[in-house]
Curated annotation (Swiss-Prot):
PANTHER family tied to this protein: UPF0178 PROTEIN YAII (PTHR35146:SF1)
Lineage: Bacteria, Pseudomonadati, Pseudomonadota, Gammaproteobacteria, Vibrionales
Full protein name: UPF0178 protein VFMJ11_0615
InterPro entries: UPF0178
Family, per entry: Belongs to the UPF0178 family.
Pfam families on file: DUF188
Record-linked HAMAP family: UPF0178
Amino acid sequence: MQIWVDADACPKVVKEVLFRAATRTGIKLTLVANHYIPVPSAANIRSMQVEAGFDVADDEIVKRSEAGDLVISADIPLAAELIEKKVQVLNPRGELYTEATIKARLNIRDFMDTMRASGIQTGGPAPLSQTERREFANQLDRILAKAKI
């Protein structure tokens, strides 16, 4: 198992939790982004810069991830594609996407896209709360413990 991060929009606090977990457990952690992302100096932590462009980082994650890996991303279509490959997907708010929940999340996302396209202002996501940060860290710990890392 290794952890892949859709790092372009990943909050700094989430990256810090991931760096601590990777340092503590030795799990391989790769941040994928279309710009340089600084990472701690450790053999198991790296940053992968891809070309700028729509979904280039997402496509790289799909290509490189394997069944049993963990991807950190809030990108719902990416999560759906990864779940089909039996990759676990955890969003930065601590929600683990599953086969049972991803279809509903895709429907909500598509509905919001339709509203935005019709000119309705929907706003963006709220900043991460302390509760969500804690939930992310707890969920990550549960996943790593289950994998016995």
